[in-house]
């Protein structure tokens, strides 16, 4: 652990951190179900479509605690990807495109892909 910290500090101080930085991207969805049974096939399949692209759930079905504004539409889902390209490739993939109509039939949704802030890539000794 100390070695990794020293190496990360060295890269940061020497200006090499930007070369090691990765910029994640996030798929964010607001979903309001109109048919709870109809969304089940989508829910059962969606993870297998984004795992090959390095995606992982950060939030799945969270009920938002709205503090200001109009609030979210239904439940929230956030999937993190290693890059914007990975997120876009997943969204455009045949596997995901095949199940999107299931979500459309089961309710109302708004979806976004946004780029996050750069993160320092893990350093392995």
Where are these regions (language model features)?
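Bacterial N-terminal signal peptides that target proteins for export
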Residues: 1-9
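Residue-level detector of intrinsically disordered, flexible termini
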Residues: 7, 16-20, 105
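Short S/T/G/P-rich N-terminal loop/turn motif that feeds into the first structured element of a domain
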Residues: 13-76, 81-89, 115-125
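A short, charged, amphipathic alpha-helix used as a generic interaction element across diverse proteins
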Residues: 91-94
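Short arginine-rich
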Residues: 97-113
């Amino acid at each position: 652990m100390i070695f990794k910290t020293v190496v990360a500090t060295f890269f940061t101080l020497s200006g090499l951190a930007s070369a090691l930085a990765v910029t994640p991207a996030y798929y964010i969805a607001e979903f309001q179900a109109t048919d709870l049974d109809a969304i089940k096939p989508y829910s059962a399949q969606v993870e297998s479509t984004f795992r090959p692209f390095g995606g992982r759930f950060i939030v799945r079905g969270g009920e938002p605690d709205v503090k200001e504004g109009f609030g979210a539409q239904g439940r929230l889902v956030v999937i993190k990807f290693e890059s914007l390209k990975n997120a876009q490739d997943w969204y455009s993939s045949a596997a995901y495109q095949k199940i999107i109509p299931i979500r459309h039939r089961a309710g109302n949704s708004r979806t976004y892909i946004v780029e996050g802030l750069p993160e320092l890539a893990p350093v392995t000794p």
